[in-house]
Amino acid sequence: MSITYNPDDPLYADADDVSREIDRVFDICHGCRVCFSLCPSFTDLFNSIDAHDGRVSELTPEERDGVISECYQCKLCALRCPYVPPHEWLLDFPKLMLRAAIQKKNSDPPPFHVRLADSVMSRTDLSGRFATAFSGLVNPVVTSKGGLIRKAMESVSGIASQRLLPPYAKRRFSTWFKRDHVANRTATGNPGREKTDNPMRSVALFPTCFVEYMDPEIGKDLVGVLEHAGASCTLPSGTQCCGAPWLHSGHIEQFRQTAAKNIEALRESATNGAQVIVPQATCAYVMRKDYPELIDSSDARVVADAVREPMEYLIGLRKGNRDLFDSLFPPLQKEGSADGADNDLSIVYHVSCHTQAQGVGLKARDLFGVLGFSVKLVNKCAGIDGTWGYKSKNYALAKKVAQPMKRAIDDAAPREVCGDCHLANYAILEETGLRSVHPIQILARAYGIRSD
């Protein structure tokens, strides 16, 4: 038996070794059960073990495969588990489930249509470039959930035809930044937009697929707020999708190739002390945690150490110079925002799984509190977690997973909902009918900030 999560280890995808490790971990989990309510994997695992009078060795292959396929890599169990490293048992349930899925894929390759769907879903930059160029034709199809064309697309892409999908933008974020914003910055000479020798105020933007191709308005608000705070924003060339779809579908080599390109694109900025701002929780998690583990290089570690989510970066600025920050972002009053607009300052903040899994705390909640907002947390999974909840084979279960989140938001009856995960935000819209925005957009509106 080998406790390895290194894909280069010869035993990583060895069927017998994986099976023995699954027995070991399932037996430990059976005796602990602290994660019993987290996800369908644990519910089915414990029910199946109980049906066999507590004997893990008697689980059927189908029962094991069900537990593996229902793990959507939310990582929350790893946060709760008392037996993760450095404990001597070295337990890491999500990594083992990924290892088991990869071993099964290697020993029993899925049918062609599944492999095709994984490939299509993982090539987000290719589809994004095409869709933004032809958004007028693509959007009526993409947004017509349950339609005939979406059903036909499901067989190729693997994306559930019933799932609400975001439309594509007419213009990419990078196009706006390079052609419009940089030119305007040069023309105006705004002091808050000049180069700085302070590393904390030098940021490299990693826009993510969603901001780049689907909602560049988030990126514009992000740039506006960062520059209002005195940061100098750059957009390094050569970045692409973080690689999460490849990783979560078990294609390690494709993930490594993608990660290596992003590391190379961001290496110089990170080495020079710039913070890498990533406005999407899943992408930030992958770059922080998976890059240095699966790309064992000093550059990968430098980039990972530089990654920050937007609200995390801003609250870091405040810790560095509270007086300056508070002069730029004075606490808001209950009767209105900084520019006098009506605002009751009451918001619901959805805490995504991958926000929690990064282990840096709830920085959006903390900053909102400092600025005078009244924040209600909804700490329930949206059932998306990367691409898992978008796949047709997982759709029914994903909807079930999302119901506690829906009930919590409905009960809060919020005027405003926000969350760091764009995919979860669309699940919120689908489940509740309420549009959830990125926290940075709440700040931009409250302080009347807009980037030209």
Language model: regions and residue ranges:
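Non-heme iron-sulfur electron-transfer modules
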Residues: 1-12, 37-70, 84-115, 437-443
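Cysteine-centered iron-sulfur cluster-binding motifs in ferredoxin-type domains/subunits
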Residues: 21-42, 63-87, 91, 100, ...
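A structural signal for alpha-helical segments
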Residues: 17-20, 59-62, 88, 298, ...
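Asp/Glu-centered strand-loop micro-motifs enriched in Gly/Pro and often flanked by an aromatic residue
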Residues: 9-30, 59
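Generic signal for short, ordered secondary-structure residues
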Residues: 8, 17-18, 50, 60, ...
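Iron-sulfur cluster-binding electron-transfer modules in prokaryotic oxidoreductases
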Residues: 91-452
